[in-house]
Every structure is written in structure tokens, then in C-alpha cells.
Amino acid sequence: MLQMPSKQPISAGIVIVAAGRGERAGSSKEGPKQYRMIGGKPVIVHTLENFMTWEAATEIVVVIHPDDEALFARAFRHIISATPIETVHGGATRQQSVLAGLRYLKDKQISHVLIHDAVRPFFDHALLDRIAESLDAGAQAVLPAIPVTDTLKRADNAGTVLTTVSREHLYAAQTPQSFAFETILEAHEKAAASGRSDFTDDASIAEWLGIPVTIVEGTADNVKLTVKDDIAMADDKLSASLLPDVRTGNGYDVHQLVAGDGVTLCGVFIPHDQKLKGHSDADVALHALTDALLATCGAGDIGDHFPPSDPQWKGAASRIFIEHAARIVRERGGTIMNADVSLIAEAPKVGPHRDAMRAKLSDYLGIDIERCSVKATTNETIGFVGRREGIAAIATATVVYRGRK
């Protein structure tokens, strides 16, 4: 059933399809391609940030694979959003995943919906505004597309060219594909009920039901990241598009050693015959790194945010402090590029625990473990560290803030 043309500015729900496995992009320890890092952030974060800052977006639902809960949670640490963002699990096909997202939005107060591939991070607000104008003018289905410019050949199974195909009236479809909400929900429900699962995009489902699809001008940059080389080119593109605002922050901390059963360093507990004395868990490494992160944006130091005189922080895990500092950095437009911690202690030995410490830093900061460094040295029995009266830590954080085009 077709809706009447909209008379009010659109209220848009956003469905971001992110349940694919991305097998053509090859395997990676970062997971499927929507979670690969480009420009210091996962692909899906760049996509989300574009929608989060678009004023017509009122609800965002990300359709993820059931196995990707942890990957999305890790990526989500990069995101500061005033627009509600929820997740639902997708199905075995893109079509099933889109329907899951649409069903989630069914009870939301939205007039229209934009359905977008998570691995298309390079769309802009000008494109979204063109789509909104077309929807607001009464279009039931809007497809961003660009004219085909390559010469097209049809070949047989052996790879022999049979004919050259005319490019006239041919367009390459993009996303976000956008619709009056009830129209596309009904279309997807009918497709599911009929057993049809061979549609390659949402506009095809609208066409199947005879719903007119209006083309608006797409952009050449709005490409889908499909293979491994696409990811590398996207990373290069982002790196080259901005004049970077690179900042380095340093932090230093020291805690006294007293009799005990172990120390916590970089979030890892190490059995020992002493412990670190402090108001919180006394993780000297995380305290130094917290100060280093705060220094990159002039946000004071750990004592300003978590005063030792405040009883609520007594015995607190220092993970709270480091994640708070990382969140402030991201709120101010920063991307954490590197974290380096040097521990100065006679004992315990750090070497056997270094990889576990790096893994903790990677988890707390939401960055690749290769960007996390932990080193240790002794003080050659000199001074309070040499006398095993305390442990010191020096930390350096490198953060890139949003530059200028």
C-alpha cells in the first residue's frame, strides 16, 4: 500500500546492515571488513558518525551477526552519539537482516527509513539531503546511483566476449536506499512470505511490487569496500584527506610498595610479596597513561577527575579512569593512535606478563594491540625504586585530532 506524499520534514530511521562475513576481503584478526581499521577507526564507526550528525536521523539500528557482539561493543567505544543506537541480530541473507532492522523500527515514530551498507563509509550529508528532499516531495522509494562509465562486456562461461553492452540508461546503484517506512516494511514482509530471497538490494523489492523508484545523484566516493585492496585504499584516502592534528601527551606516576600479595599493572594482577599502596587499586601504569591521554586535549589530570579525597574511588579499578580519559579524547574528536608505558621497578618481573598487559590496554582503549607498548626497566638498585620502596611509570599517548581539509 502506497503512502500519501509527506507534508512534514522527514523523521528518518536508519538501518545499517552489518551482519555480513566479508569473505572476499580475506581474513583478519580485526574480524569482518566492517570492523577493519581505516583512519584509526573501524569502518562501521565512520559510517555511524556520518548518520549520527545528520539532523533528520532520529533512530539508528545496526544489524549485526550474532557472533559479532564483542566486535561491535569494542567498535562502539569510539562512538559518542546523541541519536539512539541499538543493535539487532541479522539473518542468513542481507534481505533477512534488513527485515530484522525494519521490524525493530516498526514501533518507532518515524516516517521514512534509510537502509545502508555498513561498508560504505564515504557518503556525505549532501547526498542524505538530496534523498530527504526527494522523500519529502512524495517519492516512495529513492535510490542514489551514478551513471555507468566503464565499457561493459557480456561474456560466456569460458570468458570469451560475446558483445559490448550499451551504457545508455545504465546506473550503478548505491546505498542508502530510502523509502516511506510502511511501504518498504510491507514490501519486505511480502517478499519473505512469498519465499523470495534472491533480491540483491531493497530497491529491487520495491520494483517487484511495482513501487516507483526515483534515482537521485549518487557520488563516486560512495563505494562499497569489498576486497582487501579496498580497505587499504580507504585507509590511504582518509590519511591523505586531512592535515593531521597530531598531539602527544606524557604522564608520570609513582606508588609506594608495602607488604602484600601482589601488584596490579596495566590491569594485570601479578603475585608478589608486596602490593602498591593507593586510594584506588594503585595501578601506577594506568594512572600514568590516564594523565598522558588527558594531556593531549588539555583536560587536566587524573586527580581533577577522580580526587583521592572522594571516598567513592577508594579501591576502584583503574580501568574506570583510563576508559574515562579515552572517552574524553573521543568526545573532543581524537583518535588514539599509540599508547606506550614504561615501568620502573626492581620487582616483580614484567616480561612474562607483557603480552597480557598489552592486551588489556588494547581492550581498554579500543585500539589494535600493535599500537600498545609496555616496557620495563630497573633503577639499578638506586633510589626508592632501587630499594624496592615503590614502582614508577612513565606513559606517552599519541592522539590524532580531527584535522583540516
UniProtKB/Swiss-Prot annotation:
Its cofactor is a divalent metal cation. Bifunctional enzyme that catalyzes the formation of 4-diphosphocytidyl-2-C-methyl-D-erythritol from CTP and 2-C-methyl-D-erythritol 4-phosphate (MEP) (IspD), and catalyzes the conversion of 4-diphosphocytidyl-2-C-methyl-D-erythritol 2-phosphate (CDP-ME2P) to 2-C-methyl-D-erythritol 2,4-cyclodiphosphate (ME-CPP) with a corresponding release of cytidine 5-monophosphate (CMP) (IspF). The record marks 167, 224 as: Positions MEP for the nucleophilic attack. Pathway: Isoprenoid biosynthesis; isopentenyl diphosphate biosynthesis via DXP pathway; isopentenyl diphosphate from 1-deoxy-D-xylulose 5-phosphate: step 2/6; Isoprenoid biosynthesis; isopentenyl diphosphate biosynthesis via DXP pathway; isopentenyl diphosphate from 1-deoxy-D-xylulose 5-phosphate: step 4/6. One of its GO terms (biological process) is isopentenyl diphosphate biosynthetic process, methylerythritol 4-phosphate pathway. HAMAP family: IspD (MF_00108), IspDF (MF_01520), IspF (MF_00107). Residues 1-246 are annotated as: 2-C-methyl-D-erythritol 4-phosphate cytidylyltransferase. Pfam families: IspD, YgbB. Keywords: Isoprene biosynthesis, Lyase, Metal-binding, Multifunctional enzyme, Nucleotidyltransferase, Transferase. The record marks 24, 33, 279, 378 as: Transition state stabilizer. Residues 247-405 are annotated as: 2-C-methyl-D-erythritol 2,4-cyclodiphosphate synthase. 4-CDP-2-C-methyl-D-erythritol 2-phosphate binds at residues 253-255, 279-280, 301-303, 377-380, 384, 387. The gene is ispDF. GO terms for molecular function: 2-C-methyl-D-erythritol 2,4-cyclodiphosphate synthase activity; 2-C-methyl-D-erythritol 4-phosphate cytidylyltransferase activity; metal ion binding. It comes from Rhizobium johnstonii (strain DSM 114642 / LMG 32736 / 3841). This is Bifunctional enzyme IspD/IspF. A divalent metal cation binds at residues 253, 255, 287. It catalyses: 2-C-methyl-D-erythritol 4-phosphate + CTP + H(+) = 4-CDP-2-C-methyl-D-erythritol + diphosphate; 4-CDP-2-C-methyl-D-erythritol 2-phosphate = 2-C-methyl-D-erythritol 2,4-cyclic diphosphate + CMP. Its EC number is 2.7.7.60, 4.6.1.12.
